[in-house]
């Protein structure tokens, strides 16, 4: 029996990928600042390349952070500890070029437009959005984590690849690596099997490709991917170029915010374009994307839809979102209008409301900077909680 199959592919990268190094450094600096100054304004950008890291951006804070020390410690944790790896946390140069946040932006963020116009602190205690923009959140019931299977498995494989390196199960592995998973979906849009796995890992020079292929299957793929999803037709491409010795920042420059699809839903849902890392929670690029995921996940967990995408949009200096849009792709049990009204009732989607609702003024961000911001099974993140399920169910009944 044949059916109309559909293939979908997502990718992830390891913590040693140059762009992910940059994300982790930016978020490590953010976390270090938030430890002492939860109200700091941070927009921290990192560039890494051979022998150096450049930290730039705008930071307004009352605390002091030894930025070069944070950079070196973060890169050491990732595993770049020897010059022969092409990047050494101890001998690399760290350059900084930090300014304060623009007072024009601060005016809109510190006191929302509604408050400045109406001068009614009792009515509106809100932080204005730090920028205009649109953000998306998504959830699906195809996995227990409410994530699309391709990106979920890509993250699991990338994390496992780093774990076997750090645990010295495969001592010849180096920090840089990428994973790509292609999943086959049936006519009911349910995942049925894995069609292709692509995995590239940096390695020591004196190792044979055949051994890498065997070891990766034995220690990374088979312990991670459910056996039921693999079959004789599944294709494996492991280090398909044949050699991956030069990697990390020596092989490619890395920048904060260059892996926004890896960070979110692997291309399965739309993206507003703004990155997360290095930004404090007054930046709606980050906080509103987390809130949109929180909303979508609770809608799907409440069984009001099988899949759900939420769009939020903001104007700089204005607290209330200018629009809330929900798409259930024909799987909704109630109308999308009803869902929007229920969301307006039970979720405070003003920037200050999001920060309070999700308790975002804490140093929780570095752990999100590799292996995805959503659907994590190894860390507890506030936007993944399912505490609005019953409220949503009751709201649409009424």
Curated annotation (Swiss-Prot):
Residue sites binding Mg(2+) per the record: 19
GO biological process, one term: S-adenosylmethionine biosynthetic process
Major place of residence: cytoplasm
Positions bound to L-methionine: 58, 101, 252, 283
GO MF term list: ATP binding; magnesium ion binding; methionine adenosyltransferase activity
E.C. no: 2.5.1.6
Catalytic activity field: L-methionine + ATP + H2O = S-adenosyl-L-methionine + phosphate + diphosphate
Domain of life, per lineage: Bacteria
Cofactor: Mg(2+); K(+)
Spans annotated as Flexible loop: 101-111
Annotated metabolic or biological route of this protein: Amino-acid biosynthesis; S-adenosyl-L-methionine biosynthesis; S-adenosyl-L-methionine from L-methionine: step 1/1
CDD domains xref list: S-AdoMet_synt
InterPro entries documented for this protein: ADOMET_SYNTHASE_CS (IPR022631), S-AdoMet_synt_C (IPR022630), S-AdoMet_synt_central (IPR022629), S-AdoMet_synt_N (IPR022628), S-AdoMet_synthetase (IPR002133), S-AdoMet_synthetase_sfam (IPR022636)
HAMAP family: S_AdoMet_synth1
Family of this protein: Belongs to the AdoMet synthase family.
UniProt-recorded name of the protein: S-adenosylmethionine synthase
Gene responsible for this protein: metK
